[in-house]
Amino acid sequence: MTLLTAFIMTASCALAEGAVRDFTLDNILHHPERGDIHFNLYVPDSYDDSQPVPLYIALPGWEGLYFQGVGADLEWETMPFAAREYDPDMIIASAQLNDWGMTSALDAIALTEYLISAYNVDPNRVYLSGYSGGGETGSLVMELRPELYAAYLMMASQWDGELEPLAEARTPVYMIIGEDDSYYGSESLKNAFANLHALYEAKGLSDAEIDDILILNVKDADWFARRGISDQHGGGMAFPEEPGLLEWFFSKTKKG
């Protein structure tokens, strides 16, 4: 392994050999407080540090956690590759964390802060997504540091975080899930959507203003059947195909 020349917050990052579809595998952020944080990284060939670029961080589900093996996330997850096709000039990190709770939420925040500092990242265009357990982690990130991100995409998951900090930050959130998700069901996201919507209403936002920053997209059985998918949870890997999803997500920029 070779050390990157950047040392951020007295943290260093090591690069492992190997790549999968242009992602370098098992980069390790040696964080002084959080310990080692593993992630796979795509830096476009066009990147030269002269212009700020967007940053997107994906939090995989259980099948992509680090104990499953280096690069396991890239064997299953579709969103990092869909994002690269959508904007090949974006830096993309697929994190391989250790759980779907507060430990990984803090690790995800530390990784985000490191990458913003290590590369010429546009701080107004930093995006986070979470699938399955990674979605639970992402909802905790939205409780802790929602202002760090331009938008959050939550796929096939349940909401674990507190909503008030998110409502204060007004970070745009897109939730998508199968009506009969085989692992979570859809009630958790329906409730989170309703409660967050109510918080925005209480803050005086109009329906149009809320619609601009909060979406709940519940897919019925026909949506999956048309794609030959029998399981609505695992079928969440097809969500990047949803028309308008990527455009909505990556069009958001932080205000102010």
Language-model features: locations:
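Bacterial N-terminal signal peptides
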Residues: 1-11
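A domain-start/cap signature at the N-terminus of enzymes
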Residues: 13-55, 136, 140-144, 203-213, ...
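Gly/Ser-rich "nucleophile elbow"/oxyanion-hole loop immediately N-terminal to the catalytic nucleophile
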Residues: 46-51, 100-132
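Active-site machinery of serine-nucleophile hydrolases
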Residues: 55, 59-109
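Solvent-exposed loop/turn segments at secondary-structure junctions
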Residues: 61-65, 97-102, 132-136, 157-161, ...
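Short, proline-enriched alpha-helix->beta-strand connector loops that line the catalytic pocket
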Residues: 88, 167-173
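Primarily recognizes the serine-hydrolase "nucleophile elbow" in alpha/beta-hydrolase
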Residues: 118, 124-168
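C-terminal catalytic histidine-bearing segment of alpha/beta-hydrolase fold enzymes
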Residues: 174-176, 180-184, 190, 199-256
